[in-house]
Amino acid sequence: MNIFYVIVLLSFFLSKSSGFFPVIEVRIMNRRGNGRSIGIHCRSKDNDLQNQTVTSGHDMSFSFREDFFHTTHFYCDLQWDKETKFGFYSYQAKRDDDGRCSSQCLWKIMDDGLYGFDQEHQIWQIYHLIKKERKEGRT
């Protein structure tokens, strides 16, 4: 009978939906101005949030619970304009678990780059975007 309780407890704690792990919200803000939209497509190994268009001055957000092994990551593609694509990790457990995103990961996209908010130190930091090369014959 005791082994049954151990299995039930383990399955609860290992479940991503359990209340044991805090909810983390990711919010990506388009602050490019002049009415310029950005296409955003975020995904993890378990979730695909599909393509979304975020108009200037607006945000997109999603939330999730960290997995038991702290390996959760969400990668986002940004379609800056018809020719330019960038990518970045909007959440990466190894980078963000130590206070940078304890409950909320804030990202601000501006003309001069991508800024991430560090919750622990209460500062905005600039991040490097990974430029994606356009392949010939593909749109």
UniProtKB/Swiss-Prot annotation:
Residues annotated as glycosylated: N51
GO cellular component, one term: extracellular region
Compartments where found: Secreted
Its biological purpose: Exhibits specific pollen self-inhibitory activity thus preventing self-fertilization.
Record has Transferase as a keyword: no
Domain of life: Eukaryota
Name this protein carries in UniProt: Self-incompatibility protein S1
PTMs per UniProt: Glycosylated (S1b) and unglocosylated (S1a) forms coexist.
Organism this protein belongs to: Papaver rhoeas (Common poppy)
